[in-house]
Amino acid sequence: MAQSDAASGLRAGFRGLTTRGRSFLAAGITAVVCAYLLDQDALLRVGVLLSALPLVAVVVVANTRYRVASGRRLSPRRAIAGQEARVHLRLDNVSRVPTGLLLLEDKVPYVLGPRPRFVLDRVEPRGYREVSYRVRSDLRGRYPLGPLQLRLADPFGMCEVTRAFTASDVLTVVPLVQALPYVRLSGEWLGQGESHSRTLALAGNDDVILREYRPGDDLRRVHWRSTAKYGELMVRREEQPQKARATVLLDTREIGHRGSGPASSFEWAVSCVASVATHLLERGYQTQLLTDTGLAVPGPGAGGHNNAADTSGLILDALAVADLSDGGTLSRAEEPLRTGGEGLLVAILGELDDTQTARLGRLRSRTGGAIAFLLDTGTWAGLRMLAPGTGGDEFRARVRKLREAGWTVIPVRAGDSVPDLWRAAEGAKTTAPNREEAGA
């Protein structure tokens, strides 16, 4: 086994000969051949010396057995798209002998920048060295960092051997989160430590909270007045929830968005969802992310036990890898909203057809309050500039139908600011129609 390892090390050493080492070896062999043909002893000595240098370097580097350990630390572990993060590397010499020249190279995806390289001249026994580099990505996602590669080289630069560690890390680049102003929203009610006036969309004169009947509910809790009004069994919730609930719906349908890259309508929607969810968590809401694919974060088993920081991290991690779906409807998101959507619903929606608009209108009765950021995706595709009359009437019709169903609708166009639109949500029912007419 030892002989096999030695032979393997020598083969790796010969493969690691640098251009300088190969040149010296070729020149030395040539000089030896010429010295033999010309019977020149001096030239023979030069040839032997030139050949011996790279061969000795191969033997030395191949038999070098430094005991080193590496570590990596990310600051922060969740970076915001467009902002820098710093990666700290630490190399420990755990042996009793000093190291020679070490070349470090960390493996990073091209989207984060060029591969960082460092040269460490000497690390004393039981010593360590720390280096750091910066990474930056305009695209959200999860990017692997590592493994760290260690190159051993001789002092003359004749031979280099690469050895890789096995550990790697993941840098999560989350969408941009913008600070939103505090506004009073429809559907607010008594939250944790805050006095909210809740709009009971499903209640009658009694101060009760209602929801759809579920199998196993006590029939004595049926609220007959609301049952007659909505045409299906509605039951009272006897307990007052301790924490306000909110659901943020992200429309990921590819057919509902326009544009590509960071300037697309989908990326605007993802950033808007991140900002809204973070804002609601800061205000004490028990917040859940929901997509048209049925993805729910936190999942049904969470039970609301996560604190705001943990929930925010889960949602941002999910948004970091959110992608367009090939679905054509929002139907997979409707069932969770029907069964557990008594709180505030904030939906960031792409382009809708008549069927989707009607179904969203009917879904409004299941929520305590509903706000829709409806994206005019034609402005992302440049259609409004090329043909000003294209699609404008259809978009305004969708806005009108959702409002008639009880939604608070915020029309969104390319370039709009999320904080400004959020501020407009407080008085959207009276101000938004004027904005539409002005932008028509």
Question: Model features per residue range: what roles?
Answer:
Residues 1-71:
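Extracellular/lumenal glycan-associated context and N-glycosylation machinery
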Residues 42-44, 52-302, 344-348, 362:
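An amphipathic, basic-hydrophobic helix/alpha-beta surface used to engage anionic
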Residues 1-15, 19, 166, 176, ...:
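Exposed, interaction-prone extracellular/peripheral surfaces
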